[in-house]
UniProtKB/Swiss-Prot annotation:
Site positions (Raises pKa of active site His): D140
Region (Dehydrogenase ArnADH): 314-660
Protein name: Bifunctional polymyxin resistance protein ArnA
SUPFAM superfamilies: FMT C-terminal domain-like, Formyltransferase, NAD(P)-binding Rossmann-fold domains
Marked site positions, Transition state stabilizer: N102
Reported function: Bifunctional enzyme that catalyzes the oxidative decarboxylation of UDP-glucuronic acid (UDP-GlcUA) to UDP-4-keto-arabinose (UDP-Ara4O) and the addition of a formyl group to UDP-4-amino-4-deoxy-L-arabinose (UDP-L-Ara4N) to form UDP-L-4-formamido-arabinose (UDP-L-Ara4FN). The modified arabinose is attached to lipid A and is required for resistance to polymyxin and cationic antimicrobial peptides.
InterPro entries noted in UniProt: Arna-like_SDR_e, Bifun_polymyxin_resist_ArnA, Epimerase_deHydtase, Formyl_trans_C, Formyl_transf_N, Formyl_transf_N_sf, Formyl_transferase-like_C_sf, Lipid_A_modif_metabolic_enz
Domain of life: Bacteria
GO cellular component, one term: membrane
Assembly and oligomerization: Homohexamer, formed by a dimer of trimers.
Amino acid sequence: MKAIVFAYHDIGCVGLKALEKAGFDIQAVFTHTDDPNENHFFSSVARVSAEMGLTVFAPENVNHPLWIERIREMKPDVIFSFYYRHMLSDEILNLAPKGAFNLHGSLLPKYRGRAPINWAIVNGETETGVTLHKMTAKADAGDIVAQEKVTIEDTDTSLILHEKVREAAAKLMAHTLPHIASGNYSTTAQDESQATYYGRRCADDGLIDWNADAKTVHNLVRAVTEPYPGAFTFLGERKMIIWRARPVADNQGKRPGTVISTEPLVIACAKGAIEVITGQSENGLYVQGSRLATEMGIVTDVRVGPKATAQVKRRQRVLILGVNGFIGNHLTERLLKDGNYDIYGMDIGSSAIERFIGNPRFHFIEGDVSIHTEWIEYHIKKCDVILPLVAIATPIEYTRNPLRVFELDFEENLKIVRYCVKYNKRIIFPSTSEVYGMCDDKEFDEDNSRLIVGPINKQRWIYSVSKQLLDRVIWAYGAKEGLKFTLFRPFNWMGPRLDNLNSARIGSSRAITQLILNLVEGSPIKLVDGGEQKRCFTDINDGIEALFRIIENRDNKCDGQIINIGNPTNEASIRELAEMLLDCFEKHELRGHFPPFAGFKKIESSSYYGKGYQDVEHRKPSIKNAERLLDWKPTIETRQTVEETLDFFLRGAVEELGNK
């Protein structure tokens, strides 16, 4: 059976040898070039492959069409992935008629993602293992073929556990590969309700939090000890690395981080304490704990913890243009709640942000982005993160005012992008699900889906192509001039303060606001083209949490990324949304204030939006990037969103009636 192997690390070497022993005909091996900044405690797949006489490649992007074609020419029966660090496209996976299999270092569905061995120790697990599973478009989510369990002892480090997992992998493959070769194997679907996902770890994750209990600190020490960068703390500005430690039961009533004794070196945790067995200063030798205390001048009752200067770190400054809009005002609320941000905002009105006026961390000016260019340039220079949320984003305006859409959505935003390049500022740009246009994929993928729009005489696409062109310009600035950016694509976000009923009265609003207006006024609900178009509705709170995590940008994982933010499980047609809204309306406590329901009315899109409109049948996001980069999943169902949105507008309408 002809096999192509994607492999790296010790597990990759174990996999290659197991395949050879099982009689697989390995056509080629794809691996990675070694990173000079990485501690290579593991064997080289390239070297082992060469010694086995195998053909080896290390492409930067194996999913490039040229590499896909080369793999197709090899005509593999089966594909194996052993600790290969890049996702393989569906096009590659579909080239193997007998299937594609991945070996993962955990007992799936637990610990999907990166560094599962380290994470298992950090979290204090007592058991892990290896899983061989079918590969799918979603990372580590395919049906399970086989698993081998591994016990984690209290004294195991990541290196010791890695050796155990390597032995388990060899045992699993020796037993399972012959069954795959014969086609005589069964699979078990993963239980998604039990799935957990963890991202990559970096050296900074080794910072010790002495407010944790002693067992938690000890778990961190053994998870990141050699060959990893180590767990660390600071004495003032000086770094102290702890390589080996043991938990102690009694902290003697000391505050977390307080040195209880120096011989042995014992440091208090919130519960219990840690005895430092070995460690070193940043530029010192590997020594015993008591010797480390002497070298660093550590004395009893001194406190260690975060770096002294880190404790006086200033808040990040975020500039939000269009701060009074739907996303802008909800994002402001989330940032202020966090407490680590100063928000500077501009908009032509303030109706949605009046609740923030007077907050010392919220700074607002009423203004127009096309006029107040000096203020904008100054604040881009002053702030750390820029979010230009100003845009015309209501479908009727695409055909009614196409030139204004282009001028604001493209030209004015291009100026802001160029200021960010000029002053080397990070921009988080709101792309749109509209850029996918009439894409025919079942799920719209940020990295692979085609962006398909209609002919020139269909002017509704001017919004889509304006946004798409800005996406491409921003990407080019990132590639050529080092612009730090993230593009996010909202999929039908809904919630309180989405547009307002006055904008709905002139047709310039999103679908749910227009539907609510029909109910409030007792006019027929208009279903454009029968309302059969399907969308995936996302609660504003889910969306804002994802956007907040993009702003946080832990480990800089969001730099240079495009991220769909939507809820693929909340798919419904506009007609179904209207029926759900009607049901909530009839059950609402304020129902008696409004006229009887006037029924549904089917209309053609041209009579509603005007000449030049064209609609899309479905728009479902792939959210694998959001899951991987943000550790985010939407949780709120459409009905809850509809109820909260309806309640907001009905209470506003009743208040308006009372003021007349």
